[in-house]
Regions:
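Divalent metal-cofactor coordination and adjacent catalytic microenvironments
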Residues: 1-149
Length: 149
């Protein structure tokens, strides 16, 4: 599996500069750049350590082949991104990217790892690297993010 992050939320959407300065008891703006850098580093570290997205993030996952149940290690609160030009797709025998209808797969984004099951697997999938692409949205928003994070 290969994945590419499509959106990069700002770490200060999760922890604001004002919140960090209050926590650090800093009342001046001389160190704002440094504190903002620390927020970004902490944000990246927590995401890597917990394997979660702290803010809603779009990610494209690529697979050579899909199994009966394909695990997608990203979270939390995963959904298939069905925005224009996104979803569950494959490269067909003619080399054309083809999207599956929602009726052709089941997706469990509430579990970890998230699971995808193809119900009606197409017969014209090209035997190539990254033949399958699954576009997801995952992560917390301001109302669902646990206080501990």
């Amino acid at each position: 599996m290969n994945q590419t992050q499509a959106t990069f939320p700002s770490p200060t959407d999760v922890v604001s500069l004002a919140t960090a300065k209050e926590h650090l008891r800093v009342e001046h703006s001389d160190e704002d750049t440094l504190i903002t850098t620390f927020i970004g580093v902490a944000y990246d570290h927590v995401q890597a350590y917990t394997n979660t997205h702290l803010a809603e993030t779009e990610v494209a996952h690529y697979f050579d082949h899909l199994h009966e149940y394909t695990n997608i290690h990203v979270g939390p609160r995963v959904t298939i991104n069905t925005d224009s030009g996104k979803g569950v797709s494959y490269v067909n025998a003619d080399g054309v990217k083809t999207f599956l209808d929602a009726a052709d797969y089941e997706f469990d984004g509430g579990s970890y790892p998230a699971r995808l099951r193809i119900l009606n697997e197409p017969i014209d999938v090209k035997d190539t690297v990254n033949a399958w692409q699954i576009d997801t949205k995952s992560g917390y928003n301001n109302t669902t993010r646990p206080d501990a994070l």
